């Protein structure tokens, strides 16, 4: 038990270290998207920029306004990073004695709870801008959570298991992305909306003057929100690899491609209007997810009947 805790602690430590250099990679890529160089002054080729950013954020003073609900405002970012760390338990315990047979259900439960932290952080700031941003983010996450659950259930029909390891076993020779390319495209759209990334960053509005639900945050609390968001991006990249690209020898290559794709989307696409975002969630993504759920079930049923009729008798 103690050894498991030590291994998990090392995993979280490596994730937090990876987040630092992932932000550096994003800033470099965005710089080249804008035909300029990214951070290149701190250390050799800017490699020490994440360390300098961390020192700057954690050394700043946290401004506490008298109208804030201080306890909830402090606890909300801590809930965000705690949910992010709990999601990484899926990948650690998958290759361990504490294997989660219901890892898909565990992921859906944790991702649903994480949306409450956005609502609490916006409400506790007692600012109308942060409150509107938290309302938008909460409604967006709820809308796309349903489609995400439908996609995961439709994929879980194929290996007949809610364990992510079972997806790797059925993809040893042939990845599911070739058979389920439409579901993969819908999954990427849904994931970007869940992560509040461009072009669906309505909760935050990274390129605007008012930065959404986290406008009143600074110092170490802002750094914690920042780390939880980028930790979720890395976790979703691993999850997408498990679901669609399960070739064991190329795990780091595919995960890096997915992370780079999310960065390039931020540097390429513009933000959608909020009404278009909601209309796409309920009128386009959700009906298609339900159709794919029924198609997966009937395809699996017909394959089983074919095998039983031709080979079992």
Swiss-Prot record:
Biological role stated in the UniProt entry: Core subunit of the mitochondrial membrane respiratory chain NADH dehydrogenase (Complex I) that is believed to belong to the minimal assembly required for catalysis. Complex I functions in the transfer of electrons from NADH to the respiratory chain. The immediate electron acceptor for the enzyme is believed to be ubiquinone.
Catalytic reactions on record: a ubiquinone + NADH + 5 H(+)(in) = a ubiquinol + NAD(+) + 4 H(+)(out)
Pfam families assigned to the protein according to its UniProt record, in alphabetical order: NADHdh
Membrane-crossing segments per the record: 2-22, 71-91, 103-123, 138-158, 173-193, 220-240, 243-263, 289-309
Gene: ND1
Record-level GO cellular component terms: mitochondrial inner membrane
Protein name: NADH-ubiquinone oxidoreductase chain 1
UniProt keywords, alphabetically: Electron transport, Membrane, Mitochondrion, Mitochondrion inner membrane, NAD, Respiratory chain, Translocase, Transmembrane, Transmembrane helix, Transport, Ubiquinone
The enzyme's E.C. designation: 7.1.1.2
Keyword Transmembrane helix attributed: yes
GO MF entries: NADH dehydrogenase (ubiquinone) activity
Membrane-related topology note: Multi-pass membrane protein
GO process terms (BP): aerobic respiration
Enzyme class: translocase
Subcellular location as annotated: Mitochondrion inner membrane
Entries under InterPro entries matching the protein: NADH_UbQ_OxRdtase_su1/FPO (IPR001694), NADH_UbQ_OxRdtase_su1_CS (IPR018086)
PROSITE patterns in the record: COMPLEX1_ND1_1, COMPLEX1_ND1_2
Family assignment from sequence similarity: Belongs to the complex I subunit 1 family.
């Amino acid at each position: 038990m103690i050894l498991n805790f030590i291994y998990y602690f090392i995993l979280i430590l490596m994730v937090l270290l990876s987040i630092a250099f992932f932000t550096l990679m994003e800033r470099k890529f965005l710089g080249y998207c804008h035909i300029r160089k990214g951070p290149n002054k701190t250390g050799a080729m800017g490699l020490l920029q994440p360390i300098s950013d961390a020192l700057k954020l954690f050394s700043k003073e946290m401004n506490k306004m008298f109208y804030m609900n201080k306890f909830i405002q402090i606890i909300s970012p801590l809930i965000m990073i705690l949910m992010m760390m709990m999601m990484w338990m899926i990948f650690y315990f998958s290759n361990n004695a504490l294997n989660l047979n219901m890892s898909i259900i565990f992921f859906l439960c944790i991702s649903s709870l994480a949306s409450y932290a956005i609502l609490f952080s916006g409400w506790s700031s007692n600012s109308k801008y942060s409150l509107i941003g938290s309302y938008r983010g909460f409604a967006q996450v709820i809308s796309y959570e349903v489609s995400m659950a439908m996609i995961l259930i439709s994929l879980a029909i194929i290996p007949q298991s809610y364990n992510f390891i079972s997806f790797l076993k059925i993809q040893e020779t042939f990845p599911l992305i070739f058979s389920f390319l439409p579901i993969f495209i819908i999954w990427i759209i849904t994931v970007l909306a869940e992560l509040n990334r461009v072009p669906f960053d309505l909760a935050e509005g990274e390129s605007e003057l008012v930065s959404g639900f986290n406008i009143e945050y600074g110092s170490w609390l802002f750094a914690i929100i920042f780390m939880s968001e980028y930790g979720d991006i890395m976790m979703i990249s691993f999850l997408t690899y498990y679901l669609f690209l399960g070739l064991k020898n190329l795990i780091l290559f595919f995960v890096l491609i997915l992370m780079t794709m999310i960065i390039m989307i931020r540097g390429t696409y513009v933000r959608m209007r909020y009404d278009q975002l909601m209309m796409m969630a309920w009128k386009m993504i959700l009906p298609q997810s339900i159709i794919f759920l029924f198609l997966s079930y009937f395809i699996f049923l017909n394959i089983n009947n074919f095998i039983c009729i031709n080979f079992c008798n």
